Every structure is written in C-alpha cells, then in structure tokens.
C-alpha cells in the first residue's frame, strides 16, 4: 500500500450510491476514488453515517446489503469521529446559519472537527455550507472545489 492520501468524509448518500451501485452516481464516485489507489484516502465516518446506511437493509431484511455496509464500517484504516458536545455545537451553528437539516449539520461538523480535507456529497445545501471551510466533491457536478 502506498502513502496515505487525503482525509475524506463521505456523506451517507455517497456510501449508499457506491455500495448499491447507483447507476447515476457510482461512476463519478469510482473515478474520484481511482486516482487514490496509490495513496488511498482515509475515510471518516460517524455512528450517524452507520445508522443511516443500515436503515434500508434492516427494513427490507437484506442481510447481504447489511453485511456489505458492516464490512465497510469495519475496514482497517477508516476512522470513526466521535460525536462530542463540540461537534454538536458546531452543527448547531451550521444549522442556524445555513438552514441545514440536523443530520447534514452533524455530518459537516464532524468532517470539520476531524480535520478532513474533503466532504463528498450530493446535497447542494450541504455543499454550499461546506464551501470555503473544506474541499467539496459534489457528485452531481462531478467536481471538487477548494476555496
């Protein structure tokens, strides 16, 4: 394995698109991951991400899909950010300033507090709130912006 690459916080939708092979977005996600093969990104998650990903497989009793998510969340080298009071304080400020939904504000606050280089999302409001604070890969636009 090569040197460690950038630190990336994938929004829940990115993981769902990737693991469920969403025909609209999976190619853009794989293209973004491909240059990282020599220096793979460190993916950062929270228990909120894990919870959101596991809901549908549990509702539909899809044990194969559930196991796939559980494998990702137990991959060595990936990190879990603790949701501390400080993370929630930042999330509260982001929610108040940008009108984010609570989970999106928590995701962005976790990405910022864990020192991520990029957040990957499909959510325009989340991307706008993240702009200027962290690199943003907007899967819809298929580009990364740093400001």
State where each predicted segment sits.
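Alpha-helix capping/helix-boundary segments
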Residues: 14, 49, 87, 107, ...
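Acidic catalytic patch
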Residues: 21, 49, 75-97
